[in-house]
Amino acid sequence: MINKSTPILHVEAVEPGLKFWTERFGFQTTIQVPEGDHVGFAALDNGTVELMYQTYEGMKNAGPLAEAAAHGPSFIFMEVSDIQTIKKALEQTQIVQDIHETFYGAQEIVAKEPGGHYVIFSQLPAQPNH
């Protein structure tokens, strides 16, 4: 019934988000739609995770969705295999919460991506073999 879920992050400018994900985490830009002299919409993919970015300007004619998009930021939860590698990739990025253990046993670090959205990188605890 439901095949896929992809967050759309609304931002003032798409380009900083593209640079963040492609340079730090190896994502590929799969779609770019121009909006005047800049990118108005883009999709990124790393083979497992897909993200989309759209400018607030591009949302201005979207009726009630335009107002909702302006209320952000979004929170994105990303499961990772090595939290220390993620921390290194986040150098020169605003860290909101450094590596910590959660109540469910995960090791997490929270950062703000260039558009102001929160990204929670989580290394979940190993599952016992049964």
Where are these regions (language model features)?
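Short glycine-/small-residue motifs
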Residues: 118-121
